[in-house]
Amino acid sequence: MKKKKIILFGVILAISITFMVGCTTSAYDIAVKNGYEGTESEWLASLNGTDGSDGSDLTITQIYNEAVQNGYERNFFEFLDEYLSLEYSPDSSEAINRCMRSAMIVQCKFNKRSYGLTRGEEYGQQGSGVIYAINKEQGSAYIITNYHVVYSSDSDTQTRVSNEITISPYGGSAISVTYVGGSAQYDIAVLKATDDYFSSTFPLAINLVNGDVTIGQSAIAIGNPAGEGLSATQGIISVESEEIIMEDIENSSSYVSTRVMRIDAAVNSGNSGGGLFNSAGELIGIVNAKSSDTSIENMAYAIPASIVSAVADNIIKNNGNFNKGTVGITITVTQTTGYLDENDCVRIAETVVISQVSGAASGLLQANDVVKAITIYGQTITVNRMFHLTDPILRTLPGDSVTITVERSGQTIDVTVVCS
């Protein structure tokens, strides 16, 4: 059942940092199950021996045999790959420090609408943002934040978007930015800044995650909680994808459905628009909401990176206007199955079927076609979930061509559609 949530207005907050929870059963996991009580770093140190003596007496084969005797079930080469690739870090400081270099405080000033001759009262609200793209030669950058951070229904501007927005990097001064464009439906806004700061070596653009996130994955949140400055917190991904109902930003009397990830981090005003990162420092989402039920704690939400990047790219390519292409199909999920992937992570597989065809897809696609893949701008994405189809289409503009691979009457067919 979809549940009503409330988006974060005003000062937005810093969220969660976490450590990666692996989906595989590692040699260290086996050791713990068999009574080992130390940390992974202490376990690794025990394998190396003390003062260079004990460890030198052990061979990798002996270590493998010991692991097998204690329940390890993989072959020697898998063990060798795991053992040699183990990286221990006492904390997530490396990822946090990198992510902090792409984080921004976002501050907006507004004047209240006034129906008299005098200008309305001035007020402000704060949030967070991330550097989406940077041009060192030009000293410019695109910044992503939430639309609700830069928008206020009480504003006296025609668009209700602030016309006085600044960003502040970690340890840096405020930089004026211009509003490029945004989408209230997807709660994404794009800002552009030009300043010598962006020609320096300190600022970094975010790295986007490649692929889907998993339950239990670490989530490092960098933001501006309560307007107190950039900081980091930690949590995990509780649900990798779900639909929630939120109040329409531009129309408080209506509601919109949006796809989000659920995280267990405590979210407070000030972190909206801030980045959610994995343990590798890759952007996995943008924090935007929390539960409106005051009796519920540690239930917050983030817009997935696949939506964030698609909407931002659309806005940038289309000169500030979000205008996605329309394929002309209605899709539904007819079957859902849980399974384990190659890393023993729990996943969901959905059978995505076309239920209605209209517009651009008329005469090309058919009802009951099972969608297998979509190719956009030369990139083919296998459709195992409904959002594998819907998210990439957000990147397209009217006139763009997409190829949809479907299964029809036992045959696989590639169908190219020009978006309307």
Predicted regions located by residue number:
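Active-site loop architecture of trypsin-fold serine endopeptidases
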Residues: 112-113, 118, 122-123, 147-162, ...
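Collagen/collagen-like triple-helix sequence repeat recognition
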Residues: 23-86
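Short glycine/Trp-rich loop-beta-loop segment that forms part of the substrate-binding cleft
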Residues: 166-168, 208-230
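Gly/Ser-enriched beta-turn/beta-hairpin loop segments
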Residues: 115-122, 170, 180-186, 241-261, ...
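A conserved glycine-rich beta-strand in the N-terminal activation segment of trypsin-fold
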Residues: 87-94, 113-144, 174-176, 232, ...
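Catalytic-histidine neighborhood of serine endopeptidases
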Residues: 133-186, 195-196
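Terminal peptide-recognition signature
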Residues: 104-106, 129, 141, 145, ...
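C-terminal recognition in membrane/secretory proteostasis and scaffolding
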Residues: 13-18, 54, 69-72, 192, ...
